[in-house]
C-alpha cells in the first residue's frame, strides 16, 4: 500500500475537521463548559449562605438556565430572537434559576426555585435555541444562515470577548537575576485558583541563601523557616525534599545555617506572624500566620491545613529548579515558549466575572435576610432576592469591556466591515503586555507558534506582535480534572515524592538509584518519580490513543545531560493542533479512512478516537518529529502535518501565492483584507448597524486558495476581478496611485452603498417629565428654522425614500429643560429644548428604512437608516491581495485608455515602479493565473506550497494565443500609436477599501468656534478649521510676511477688542446703565482705549489674574496712518 497521501486526500481530512469544528469552536466550547460545569461549581463553592442570626442559613442547590427572553414594561415575559434583540436594543440573555433551601435550627424548609439574574447568551452556544434551528428556520427569524455565532448581544450591539494570552499559572519559571543586583537567580510562580491569583517569588542571594516572598507577608521569608512553618522540621527532611542529589543538597547549607535558631513549627510560624500581626500576643501571631499560609501561599494546592506538606514539597521542587539553574544544569525558562502560555477564552473570563457578581449577590442577600428576620417576618426568599445585582454586573462588564481584575478592552464591538473581518475578530488573541514598552522578544515570532498562531496576521505599529490571530487548525484545550490524571499516573507505577524520600531516609535504599529515575510533573507540580521516563511517556501516549485517557492530556519527556523529566499537562488554555500519527514511516490515516470521511460514515473526531490523529500542545511537540509532506517520511518520524498551509490564519489564507511575496507585504494584506467592502452579512437589509458598507457586485476571485471555501469567502466575497495593465501612463499613476477606467465605473464596477443609522428614544426623567418625538414648535429653545424640519411627517419622523442632506432633521424631538429654575421662569412652550436628530454635516443620502418600536422599559425607540451611493472617485483607496495599496489618481474614459490588438481595455492601470522594490511576485503570478482562468473558464488553485505550477499555466495561455509572460502589443488610445514595448495584461482581484474621499473631504470658510478660547473648532465632524501650527508660523516669520502672519493668527482666528485703562493697564468692563466702559479700579475716572488682541491672550491674562499675578498692559499713543511725532 502506497503511504503517500495525495494533496486532495489530505484536503478531505481538513474539510472533515472544519465540518465538525467550524471556525469559532474555541469560544463555543469554552462557553459551553462554563454553562455546563463551571456555573454550578461556582454555586457549590459558596455552598450555603450563612447569617448572623443563630440557627438560620440558606443552602444552595442546583442552578438552571431558562430560554432567552425579555421582560416587557408591562411585566409580561416572552421569548426573543437575536434579531429582535438587535433591533430593539435589548440584551440577548436567559434567566438563571437557583434552588434555595432555607434551614432553620437544622430543619429544612421547602426548596424554592428563585430567579437570581440574567446571563447573556453566546449565539449558537449549547443554551442558545437557535443552535438547533435548520437553515430555513434561521432565515425565517432573520439570521444569516452561515453566521458562526460566538458573540453576545448587549443593549442591541454585538460584542466579542477577545481571547487573552497569559503566562501559564501554577508553573515554576526560573530566570537569572538582574546584573548588578544582590539576587543571582529567581523563580516565579503565579499561583492561580478560583477567583484570585497570588504571585510567589523565590530568590537566591549572592551569599547562597534562598528567600521566598508573596504579597500577604511583607519582606522576604528565609526558605528553611517557611519549610518548618509548613511542617517539615529536620534539616535532613528539608534537604531531601529539595533533591536526592548531594551536589544540590550542598547548596542549601547557607540557608540551613541562617535558620538554625528556629527549630520548631511554632517558632517558624511566630517568625512569619511577627511581620503580619505586629504587637499582638504570640498565640494570635501564630494563628494569623497559619491563616495566611493556608490562604495566600500557593492557594492552587489547596487552602486547608492538610495541604501544607503538599505546599512544602512544591516549594522544595521550585528551589531545586533554581539550584539547577545556578549550577548550569538547566537553561532559564523561555517566557515566550508557547508551552508556557495559556489562552483565556470566553468561558474562563465569564467564570471569573460571574464569581464576583455572585459573591456580591450573596452578600446582599445575607444582609436582606438578617434585616427581614430581625423584623420577625416569615421568610419569603423571592421577595428578598435582588436579581439585578448579577444582571447588571455582567451586562456592564460586557458593555464596557472593563473586566474584573482591572483588565480593559476584554469585550469589543464585533467588526462587521466584511465577512472576513468578523471571523478574524472572533479568532483574535490579545497579549496582556503593556504596548508602551518595547518587549522585543514577546513580539517576535516564536518557533513554537508554528501551526498555532498566524505568522502574518498582526497589526502594524505599537500592537505589532502583541495582537495575534489563531492559525486555521489551532484548537484550545478546555481541560479536565487533574485528580483523574494523577490517579492514573499512580496506577501506572509512579512513586509519590514522599514515598521516595521515605525509602531513602528511613528505608536505607540507595539514593543514587533514584537519581537515575525520571521526575513526573503534572500541570507544573512534582507528583512523583518513575524508573524510565521514556517508557512512561510512551505508555501515556498509547493509552491516550486507545481512548483510555482523555485526549486532552499531553505529555512531554525532557531529557538533557542533567535533567530527566516527564511533563504531563491537562489544564485549560493550551493551544494544540492536530497531526496524523506515523508508525514505521507510514501514516495511520489510510485511503480507506479518507473515503469513509468523504462519504460521511465517520467524522474527524472518530479518527481522533481511533488513535490515528492526535492533538499536540507545544510541550509535547518538542518530542515529535513532524514531516511536512508524506514524501518526506522516514521510520524516525512520529507525525505528519495534515496540511502545511494550515499554519496560516484566516486572512492570510486568502492570499494567492503568498510564499512568493516579501513577508511584510502579506502582513499588510492581512490588515487590508479586513477593510475591503463586500457582502458583510446576508441579512443586511434587516440589520440596523451604526455604519455599514455594501459592495453592489462582489465577485468570487478567479485565482483562489483552497481555504476560501472553508472560510465561506466564496459566498461572501469582497472585491472584483479587474483587468490590470502594468504601464506608466499619463503620469497620473505615480507613487502607488492607480488609473481606473471611467467607463467600467459607469457600468457599475466597484459601486457600493454606505448605510448610516440615526436613532433616538423617548427617555423618561425623574419628576414625571419625558422626551417627546414630535415636530418641534417654533417657540422651543434651539429651534433650527422651518426649512430644516420640512421633511418630517406629522409623527415627527422622516418617511422612507426621501433625499436628505447635512443639517436636515430626521427625527424631531423635544426634551424638558436641564435645570429646574428655567422651568419656573419660562412659559411651558419655551421651557422645552429641541434635541432633534439631524443628518451629519457634510453627509447626504436617501432614507432607506424607518423603524419605530419600543425598548424593554417601554420607551418609544426610533431608528432611521440613511443610504448613500458611493461611486469610485479620485482619492478612493483600492488594494490587490498582495499588500499593494493605492488611490485612484485619475479616471480616464475608455476611448483614451490603452488597448490591445484584440480590443481589450484595462480596468486598472498600475505603475510598474510599484513592483520591483516590493518584490510581490505573487501579484504578477496572479495576473497570469487570472488570465488563464478567464480564457479557460476554470478557477485556478493558488494555495501556498500546493499550487498549480505557474509554468504549466504559461504553457496553457500560449495555447490560447497569448504570450507566456502575459504581455501584449498595446496601442495608446489617445493617439492610436503602437506603444513601443509590450505591456503586461492580467486579471487581478482588487478590493475596494472603506477609506473613501466622501468620508474625509473637508474644508471650511466660517463656522463654529470654541466657547473658551473663541478659536475655530477642530475636526471634520465639528466643521472645524485646519490648524495653522507652530511650525507653519515659523515659516511665515522666516519669510517675513507680517500681514499674512497677522491674517492667519489674529484676523481669521480669534481677533477681539478689549478696552484698557490708560492709568492702571487693567482690562475694563462695559457698564450697561452708563453705556460706557469702566475700569475695575478707577471706575469712570480714567479713560479706556480699545486694543485689538487675540482672545486667547485676553484669556491668559485673566487666568493669570485668578492666580494672583497682575499683568498690566501699558498703552502708548496710537500711531496715525500719516506718521506720528517721530518718537514712537
UniProtKB/Swiss-Prot annotation:
Alphabetically sorted, this entry's keywords are: Cytoplasm, DNA-binding, DNA-directed RNA polymerase, Metal-binding, Nucleotidyltransferase, Transcription, Transferase, Zinc
Write down how the cofactor binds this protein.
Answer: Binds at least 1 Zn(2+) ion per subunit.
Residues reported to bind Zn(2+): 1061, 1064, 1079, 1082
| Enzyme class label | transferase
Required co-factors: Zn(2+)
Where does it live in the cell?
A: Cytoplasm
Name the catalysed reactions: RNA(n) + a ribonucleoside 5'-triphosphate = RNA(n+1) + diphosphate
Q: What is its EC number?
A: 2.7.7.6
Q: Which residues of the sequence carry a binding annotation for dsDNA?
A: 178, 181-182, 206, 435-439, 1027-1032
At the top level of its lineage, which domain of life is listed? Answer: Archaea
Q: What SUPFAM superfamilies would the database entry show? A: beta and beta-prime subunits of DNA dependent RNA-polymerase
Indicate the quaternary assembly. Part of the 13-subunit RNA polymerase complex.
Family assignment from sequence similarity: Belongs to the RNA polymerase beta chain family.
The task this protein performs is described as:
DNA-dependent RNA polymerase (RNAP) catalyzes the transcription of DNA into RNA using the four ribonucleoside triphosphates as substrates. This subunit is involved in DNA promoter recognition.
Name of the protein this chain belongs to: DNA-directed RNA polymerase subunit Rpo2
- Taxonomic lineage from the root: Archaea, Thermoproteota, Thermoprotei, Sulfolobales, Sulfolobaceae
Q: Which gene encodes it?
A: rpo2
